[in-house]
Every structure is written in C-alpha cells, then in structure tokens.
Design a protein with these regions (language model features):
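FIC/Doc superfamily catalytic core
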Residues: 1-131, 135-249
Length: 249
C-alpha cells in the first residue's frame, strides 16, 4: 500500500535481482515480508482465525521494519487517521477486534462472502495497528478464503481508488458492506478462472487480441471481463483469456 515499487520491481526483489533505480529500503523489506507472510498462509491455512494468529501475522509483516509496533495493537495515544476517517479509540481496540473475531467465528450460517466482507470492512474501520492495516486486512481476506478451501484473491492496485476504497466510505456512513461482497465475488471468480485456464488452456492471449479474433468490440470484451461473464483474468494487471474460448461455450 502506498508503495512506489512497480510490479516488475517487486518481482526482481523477490527473485533476488537488482533494481536499476534507487528505491526506499523500507519498501524493499515490506515487499519481502509480505511475500513471507503469503507463504506462511499456504503452509498453515487450516488454522482458525483468532487474535493470537492476527498478531503473529502482523509481527511477521513488520519485524525488522518497525520493531516497536510489530505484533501488537495500538495503545495509549496511538491514534491513526486515514483520509477523513479516524480509527477507533486505542483503549477499545483489543476488545473491538475480539468481538469482530468472535462474530466471524460464531456466525457460520452467514453467506461466507458476506462474513468475509463484513469482517474486512469493520477491521479496516477499527484500524487496529499503528501501521500495516491495509496489508493485514487483505492478508486476512485470503486467510479466510483459503481456510474455506478457496483460492486467494488480488485487489488490483490500478483499480483500488475506483473500486475498493470508495466502499469504505459507504460502509462507514451506512454500515452496508454489500459492495465488498460483490467485489470479492468478482475477484474470486477471476481467481478461479485464472487457475482453471492456466491448468487447461493450450495458449493464453491478451483479451484485446482475443476480441479482435472473435469480432468482439474491445470495450464490450473489457466490460464482460470486469463482470466476469467471460473467463478472463488479469496477469501483470493486463486482462488475459484462453485463446480457444468462444462466447458460445
């Protein structure tokens, strides 16, 4: 979040390469830590969601980056503000997160994406940490999905300001989280389409090329991809699809 690193920069860092430009050392550490955190989810995705695990994940995220605040909630006078939103009073943060975790674990009859969406909206509204709230919130989404046997989702950087951040303003003024449910449903479909296509497609091509081959207007193809009415998905933030896919399939 708020990083100047490009996708290509991040890939070079994680593969041990050297960047051709100077970057903030903290951002390099943050990229590596987030990768480590993601790997840990793959190894331990059956663990239940609880306070201990949330704090352990946060500690992994910020160790060697900001040790004094790693692995603990805000306390004392550690107030945080994001735009016009003021995070919850530090005095009540531990209790608020415990209530949120209990609500998530106890309401098993709730539609699973509604449960994940509500948890995420409320977690970010509380903003329990001094730093790393956005990254932690998105990590927890994937922890919850993977615990249900589903693949992780990616909230694309390019569309955050138009499709993701406005949903928080809506939630904080109305307490309605349906927008998050709808967004996560689309991203989950995209994640599944991506995995199925990678495993089954003979050739994967850009959506723009596919549209040209099939005689579909590019803007119509793009809209279908965004609505997930065709099995398109993003790689390096570019829409892709199985070359053999036909709209009549």
């Amino acid at each position: 979040e708020n990083s100047t690193l490009t996708l290509e920069d991040t890939e070079k860092i994680l593969s041990g390469g050297t960047l051709a430009r100077n970057v903030n050392v903290r951002e390099v550490f943050e990229a590596k830590k987030l990768a480590t955190l993601t790997e840990s989810l793959l190894e331990k995705n059956n663990s239940a969601l609880n306070i201990k695990r949330i704090l352990a994940l946060h500690k992994t995220l910020l160790t060697n980056i900001d040790e004094p605040i790693a692995g603990r909630f805000r306390t004392g006078k550690e107030w945080v503000r994001v735009g016009n939103h003021l995070g919850s009073n530090p005095q009540f943060v531990p209790a608020l997160i415990q209530e949120l975790v209990d609500h998530y674990n106890q309401h098993k009859s709730l539609y699973f994406l509604d449960a994940v969406a509500h948890f995420h909206a409320e977690f970010e509204t509380i903003h329990p940490f001094v730093d790393g709230n956005g990254r932690m919130g998105r990590v927890l989404i994937n922890l919850q999905l993977m615990h249900l046997g589903l693949p992780p989702i990616i909230i694309q950087n390019k569309s955050k300001h138009t499709e993701y951040y406005p949903l928080f303003t809506q939630y904080q003024s109305t307490m309605k989280f349906g927008g998050f449910t709808e967004l996560f449903a689309l991203l989950l479909q995209e994640s599944l389409h991506k995995r199925i296509t990678i495993l089954t497609a003979k050739k994967i091509i850009p959506l723009s090329k596919w549209a040209l081959q099939k005689g579909v207007k590019p803007n119509i193809a793009a809209n279908k991809a965004k609505r997930q009415t065709i099995p398109a998905f993003r790689m390096r933030e570019k829409w892709m699809i199985d070359e053999a896919y036909s709209p009549s399939n």
